[in-house]
Structure formats: C-alpha cells, structure tokens
C-alpha cells in the first residue's frame, strides 16, 4: 500500500513529475485495456449480493469452487475451439491479449433478473468484438423474481439481441443452482418447465434465435425433473468441472459448449476465469453465430 501523503503536497507543482507520471499511467491504461486487478467473487461461505451472480455462482455449490484443480485438470489439457465467459468480476480485460492467447469465443454477462445490468458488459461486448472474437451475451435467471417472458424481454432489450454479422452468438439463459437460496428457486418441476419455455418463446420471438441453455446435469435433472422439452430446440452449454467428459442432463443428446473449469487462466484477464470448449470446429462455431446449417 502506498504511504499516505497529504492532499496539499500531492497537489503542489501541477506541471511537475508527479502529474506527468499520472498522465503516462492513465494513457498506458487506455492503450492496453487493462486496469486494476479484479475483485475476487465471494468465497463459498459468503452470500452473493443480489445482482452480482455470475455464470457458475450456483454450480460451485454443487461441484465445489476448486474441483478442477483438485482433479489435476488444467485449462491447456483441453484442446479444440476455446472460449471464456466473464462478468464484472473479471474487471478490465485486455481482449487483444485474450485473442492472442488462442481464445476464439467469449460470452459476457449482460443482465440478471429484471433490473440488473452488468457494469462491464458494454466494455466487454465491444472490446471482444474489436479484438476479433466471436462473442455473445448471457442472462442470469431469477425464476423467483418474475416470469420467464419478462426476463427474456429484459435480456433482449439490454444486450441479448442478435445480428447476423458473423461475430454474434445467440444469447444464453444461465439457469443453475440458486446462489441466493433454495436450489430450484421455490418452483415445482412443472412451474420451472413453464418458466423456461416462456423465456425461450419470448427470446425466439424477439431475436429469431434459439436461446442457448447453460446448466448442470444435477440442477436440470432435479429442478425440471429431467425434462426433455428443450433438447430439440436449445443448444446445451453444460457445466461440469474437474472431469475428462461432462455429464449431460437428461433429454439432451449432447453438449454444444462445455464449461470445464472455473479456475482457468488466460493472458489479458486478471485472476481466475471460466474456460470453455466448443463441441466442433471453428467453422461450426461460425455457423452457430450465423444461424446457418
């Protein structure tokens, strides 16, 4: 920590070396796209503040925050088309460095519930696009706050839209173990199915795309009762850390994206970041972005 200096001393000689150094530092931050180290998400025994959940905030309740490390699996153990998912918890990101590290796609948090917009979404969405990544947005579901249609509309209006520009992936419904309370948000399996279907239908009507579903096998099988109703409509993004092959929820024939660790490292990102693998070639990733066969 820097030693304290009185304001009067720090403001002396505005044309001097102190001011010049500050200006150089500010310019360097703008040029590199990096900033102060990101704040770490709450530890497993700390509550998550409303609006501040992230992709995997509930998954860690099921699977443990360090299960990838415990299994000895490192990010580079998985080859193929690689991606990351981020939120405000990662702070400022140097997307040029991320791209240079071999990352092809990224998803970033846009919204949660009906009132929260991620503070880093605009910077992440624009920065990743400018760096040449294929990117998309995700919505952290709060089924106990409103119906699915309302949240899908909020998401589509605040970052979850889609355009056929070759760089925009369909939006994601992040629906996982509730990090704020009861696992299934107080809904029955029938109510949860209705909620998810309403979200899907509204998002489809707004964007003409099938929403991607992020979940775990454990949550889906418990909270939807192993529902098969989405398997022919939504691509599956499954979270399963610390394993060589992910468990797929009932009803889904396979996975499209696999989040295989919550403790990955990538140049340009401060601290841990979720790492993901796309199930297919880069050409297939482009096809998903363009909505082509």
For the regions a protein language model found, what residue spans apply to each?
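Substrate-binding cleft of extracellular glycoside hydrolase catalytic domains
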Residues: 73, 77-200, 204-206
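Functionally critical loop-and-helix segments that line ligand-binding/catalytic clefts
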Residues: 41-91, 229-293
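Catalytic domains of cell-wall/extracellular-matrix polysaccharide-remodeling enzymes
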Residues: 167-251
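Short alpha-helical interface patches
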Residues: 6-9, 88, 95-100, 176, ...
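Flexible, glycine-rich phosphate/dinucleotide-binding loops
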Residues: 115, 144, 220, 245, ...
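Secretory targeting and sorting signals
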Residues: 1-40
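Short acidic, gly/pro-rich beta-turn/loop elements at beta-sheet edges
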Residues: 94, 147, 223, 248, ...
